[in-house]
Amino acid sequence: MSRFSLCLLIFSGLFSQTTSAQDLWWQAILSSAPVEKIQQAITTGGAWYRCETQDSTDAFCLDDFHYYHQHLYGESTIEDREVYLSFLTEYQPQSLSELILNLRKDGLVMQKVEIDGQQYDISEAMRHATPEEVDKDLIVFINRYPQQAPRSIDWVLAQEFGTPTPRLNVMLNSDGEMIELKVIRF
């Protein structure tokens, strides 16, 4: 084996370990792992570092979270039984659409949508209509507004839809200038 091949093999092994290590904390967020495991993944996983500008000693920053093909800046605050995450990116219509698609890929479903001050409560609608009717009404509601209109979409894991205390709450906010993804893991 040539020296170049050996170096390439070692480098690719190191790179793949780094890449998978960066994803471990996000996979832990989505899993049923206890909050302590998530806190440990953030504080010792290597991707996050202590924020220098925060007053709190339990605030961590992430300069570049590759959420599928999107680049997000993140902050995390850790409390006793909760982890708060906030991710930001500049608003672009395609970025908003991709975030929605990626949240769905990760097993999350919309629970409530507010656009330009008007609200559609999916949980409530499901009590009075079939899932197909709710899907149709939701699409009509969303398409009523321009994509850059201020919006907030509440998400939960599909298996926790309708439960009073889900272990994961996600809120996708957009004001036409920035997109914020807030995640609370209990």
Regions found by a protein language model. Name each.
Residues S5-L14:
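Bacterial N-terminal signal peptides
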Residues F11, V140-N143, L168:
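Intrinsically disordered, low-complexity boundary segments flanking structured domains
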Residues Q17-A129, N173-F186:
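Short helix/turn-capping signatures at newly exposed starts of structured segments
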Residues E114-A158:
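Mixed-charge, low-complexity intrinsically disordered segments
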Residues V156-M171:
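Low-complexity, intrinsically disordered Gly/Pro/Thr-rich segments
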